[in-house]
């Protein structure tokens, strides 16, 4: 299985980085071919300008700065996203990766006369999100869990029709104990093995 792990956190020593490392190790231990895309470490540019947004713009696969990211996405059978949830969703760096790479011609194509896109990432069979929240699960449920909906209702439908999605979350991160963080790392490891 070829797995693309996408990590988005600006601090190399963060708990998110520990989750990233745990995920990569667990996936490799089961024999996956893991491609780690650390958006901050690779200095990904999340800025989508007006020219790139234009319908006349060449697709992302034809842009020298985005082509390698498109290739990595197209190689993957499985996606694992690791990031903190800030203000209800992923960091802007991750959202910029979606905006610039998951574009028409790569992730979907428009269907004439329809509002529904046609999926183009049919090789992707699963998406797993590993995230942390500063707030409680209850607060996130009341807010409608926009980050979770982004993955389960939007990204997943651009993948294989039977693609699975999993959401591994540590809530109340700002108040967790070392034992709670260790237990979450263990949960991540066991889920991905």
Where are the model-predicted features located?
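Short histidine/acidic/glycine/proline-rich micro-motifs that form metal-
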Residues: 10-13, 85, 134-138, 172-175
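Short, glycine-/small-residue-rich phosphate/pyrophosphate-handling segment
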Residues: 109-157
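Short, structured loop/turn "capping" segments at alpha-beta junctions
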Residues: 104-109, 161-165
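Active-site donor-binding loop signature of nucleotide-sugar glycosyltransferases
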Residues: 39, 132, 170-172
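Short beta-strands and strand-loop turn motifs
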Residues: 6-7, 130-131, 169
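A structural motif corresponding to the C-terminal end of an alpha-helix
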Residues: 30, 76, 82, 122-123, ...
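Glycine-rich phosphate/pyrophosphate-binding loop and the adjoining helix
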Residues: 138-142, 146-193
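N-terminal beta1-alpha1-beta2 submodule of the flavodoxin-like/Rossmannoid cofactor-binding fold
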Residues: 1-106, 179, 183-193
